[in-house]
């Protein structure tokens, strides 16, 4: 169902039961899945792929070309999974030749005025609060929650089940299962509340706590801590996830908080 004041390029591919409100513009190389609602004054540009049962609120712009001077017009996409909600004035740029696409997973909530830049890979069940700004090439694991007005530096990796406090500047990688708080952004403990809500057992949570006590509280450098964890702690999916994430970190992980003269709480 579309409103007569909506413009839809004849080459766009819309599944059944897509509803589009007035004054929205949909370009030609666009695919929209069944049951999705598009609000008024939305612009959906070439290369956008939207899954089933999504909700796109007024003013959003999806699939615009990257804000990257190296972009040379290559054919790329912006892909959004199923059951994802994109609130007012969100912008999601399509990819560059680096990854070829920007991707937002299924069951995500991207709140108003947030920006997701080129080549980002956002997992499933993620929440970005109002005005979160994510630079290019960021990788964000499933079940990440980021508080409002935070900014994420390009190429940062954020592990799954992570909570990042509002107003944060994320310039280092954030390992999985933790809370990241304060300025400068620092380890704030294990995200126990979030893990309990998602069905993690007390044994699993305590195992994760043991791992991060070694990383942040035992006086080891990062390499020593990882070696100790592999040698001394029982193997588990959580242990392997944390160890692999830290070993592959390109920007280094956030540190334990250490109050300095210029720090702000």
Name each model-derived stretch.
Residues 1-5, 10-11, 16-17, 53, ...:
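Terminal amphipathic alpha-helical/low-complexity segments used for targeting or macromolecular assembly
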Residues 2-186:
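Structural signal for interior beta-strand "rungs" in well-ordered beta-sheet cores
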């Amino acid at each position: 169902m579309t409103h007569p004041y909506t413009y839809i390029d004849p080459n766009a591919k819309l599944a059944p039961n897509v509803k589009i409100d007035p004054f929205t513009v949909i370009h030609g190389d666009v695919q929209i899945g069944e049951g999705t609602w598009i609000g008024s004054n939305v612009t959906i540009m070439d290369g956008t792929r939207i899954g089933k049962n999504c909700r796109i609120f007024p003013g959003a712009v999806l699939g615009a070309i990257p804000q990257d001077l190296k972009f040379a017009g290559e054919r790329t996409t912006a892909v959004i999974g199923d059951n994802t909600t994109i609130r007012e004035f969100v912008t999601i740029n399509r990819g560059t030749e680096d990854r070829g696409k920007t991707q937002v997973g299924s069951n995500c909530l991207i709140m108003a005025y947030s920006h997701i830049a080129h080549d980002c890979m956002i997992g499933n069940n993620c929440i970005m609060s109002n005005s979160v700004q994510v630079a290019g090439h960021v990788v964000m694991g499933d079940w990440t929650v980021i508080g409002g007005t935070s900014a994420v530096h390009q190429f940062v990796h954020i592990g799954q089940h992570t909570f990042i406090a509002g107003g944060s500047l994320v310039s280092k990688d954030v390992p999985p299962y933790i809370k990241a708080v304060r300025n400068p952004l620092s380890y704030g403990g294990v995200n126990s509340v979030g893990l309990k809500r998602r069905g993690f057992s007390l044994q699993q949570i305590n195992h994760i706590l043991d791992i991060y006590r070694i990383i942040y509280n035992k006086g080891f450098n990062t390499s020593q801590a990882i070696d100790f964890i592999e040698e001394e702690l029982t193997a588990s999916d959580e242990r392997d996830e944390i160890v692999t994430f830290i070993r592959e970190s390109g920007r280094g992980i956030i540190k334990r908080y250490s109050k300095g003269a210029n720090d702000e709480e």
